[in-house]
Amino acid sequence: MKRPIERLPAATSSATRAFALATSLLYACAAPAASWTASWQASPQPVWAEDFLFPSNVPAELHDQTVRQLARISLGGTRVRIVLANTYGKRPIRIGRATLAKPGSERAAVATGSLHDVTFGGRRTATIAPGATLLSDPVAMPVTALSQVLVSLYLPAATPMETFHWDGRQTGWIVVGEQTQSHALQLDAADSQSTSARLLLTGILVETETATRTLVTLGDSITDGASASLDRNSRWPDFLAERLAPHGVAVVNAGISGARLLSDGMGASALARLDRDVLAQPGASSMVVMLGINDIAWPGTAFARNAAPPTLEALIAGYRQLIERAHNRGIRVVGATLTPFEGALPGTPLSDYYHPAKEALRRQVNEWIRHAGAFDAVIDFDAALRDPEQPSRLAARYDSGDHLHPSDEGNRAMAAAVDLDVLLDEVPDGTPAEPRADSATK
């Protein structure tokens, strides 16, 4: 809470008053401390076996190859750091060299004069231990909000791909040899590859001249952007970042396709990854939670044929744990209702994803999210996307075609539905506000 202005007693000596005045002027004139803030994120997942329902779309191993990845940051800064992860690896990963640059006009090309070496403890080479992350040294490369950066990583030794982010919604490139310094890659070479997954790169931090805030979106494939257009930055957190950038607020996406609240899915459960993906993010002050539809719909499908469906009480207990743990770290928690899914995933091995009993549980969950007062605010994505004539279905104009994931227009509508005044309503000292029934939906 804000502290009241403290006045010196009238009997205070003139010397004491002079000292107090000098001290206050010193603090008033001091330059604000620089602050490191998360500006981009891709949550790590374990690479699954070849017999899994979906292909991983990444090589089993890289050796003497360079990976170049493009990422759009949400907030700018004066310097940049990258975060690499070997979260699920069983062996150390050697980084032979890394560079950071701004993209040129051609695909995978570096803008002239923008190439910077990335170092780790002052060295160009580094090793990521199994289960560990690696934070780079600061790179003096000023970047602006919503701009793109190119990260190139050279892997000189045989490197099994055991950690990735499956659905990056952005093309990356893999070429033979040490090409981190190359301004243009030979993408038409027979041994070059492309992937839409994120490899090793899990975070980008920026240094700002004043303290800033980061909003983390914790979710599943709807947040991760399944069905969003490739290379368009058209996930709902991307559109929300465009709205929040003028307010100096970063948005980082902690969505994982196939994620669940209570149990592991195509990645760790939200309860298991909260510390890593949200609480540990520099500058994190708020998070939006949109999770639960896979918990409800997976049982009885090819993903979890014999699993029992969760109870409403179990889901509520999971949400409350997320809220309590975030509040314990001074992070505000905004709940988002679950969007309609009748008819989801037709013609796929998951065509039994929808069932009327599952729909009934979704509606119960949404009523609790809206009215329980457990969250600091609520975003009603269900109301924003549902067909008013058939509320168990997505409105046709927002449906990507699989009746589960929103289209680009649907993602834009989700971001537009958010009331920024309520979303950003925080107590000045970072203490979470008392739970309130206000909606963060327009």
Task: Give the role of each language-model region.
Residues K2-F19:
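Bacterial N-terminal signal peptides that target proteins for export
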Residues R17-A28:
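Bacterial N-terminal signal peptides
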Residues P32-L218, A228-D231, E426-K442:
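N-terminal secretory targeting modules
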Residues W40, H63-L70, P92, A98-G104, ...:
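Conserved SGNH/GDSL esterase-like catalytic core that processes O-acyl groups on lipids
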Residues L271, A297-P299, T339-K442:
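Catalytic His-Asp segment of secreted/periplasmic serine-dependent ester chemistry enzymes
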Residues Y319-H327:
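Surface-exposed amphipathic alpha-helices with a cationic face
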